[in-house]
Amino acid sequence: KGLETTIAATGLTLVGIFNMMGTLISGRVSGIIKKKYVLSFIYFTRSIVIFLLLTLPTNNFIIISFSCLIGLLWLSTVPPTSGIVANRFGTRYLSTLFGIVMVSHQCGAFVGSYVGGLVIDIYGSLDLAWIMAIIISLFSAIIHFPIVEKEKSEEIFA
């Protein structure tokens, strides 16, 4: 949409910086609030941020704001997700199990990138891909609610 390259580069930089902050914050909050609720909040908020990107006029302020917000939400799912895996299955095989989670995530990232490219080729716009991202984020927010988290035990902290 005619974005200046310096704004795009700045936005990408801000995503990385805010990724670190979001991950630290979600890790801390996940120790206080049930991890499934933290994940649901992150995914729901992500859907709102993407919706706002689609509906607000595209300008430098919106792009910079979006970059900061999506950065906060992007990798912030990692601490609560690894916490849920540890809670459900213990820490003995946490590295292997979380490795499987991450490989699955990367496969999803490949599919998402590929589909995004197809959407541009077919429709000449990424709007449909953003709409799909909103739907997937809302779905993700919903499916985390039924997760049963065990009460904290010594094994989880090992």
PLM feature segments, named:
Residues 76-89:
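Intracellular juxtamembrane helix-capping segments at the cytosolic ends
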Residues 131-158:
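Multi-pass alpha-helical transporter architecture, strongest
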Residues 23-34, 120-121:
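Helix-to-loop junctions at the C-terminal end of transmembrane segments
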Residues 5-6, 91-101:
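Loop-to-transmembrane helix entry/capping segments in MFS-fold secondary transporters
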Residues 37-52:
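Structural signature of the two symmetry-related core transmembrane helices
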Residues 62-76:
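Hydrophobic core of transmembrane alpha-helices in multi-pass small-molecule transporters
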Residues 16-17, 106-107:
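Short hydrophobic/small-residue motifs within alpha-helical transmembrane segments
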Residues 118-136:
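A membrane-interface helix-boundary motif in multi-pass transporters
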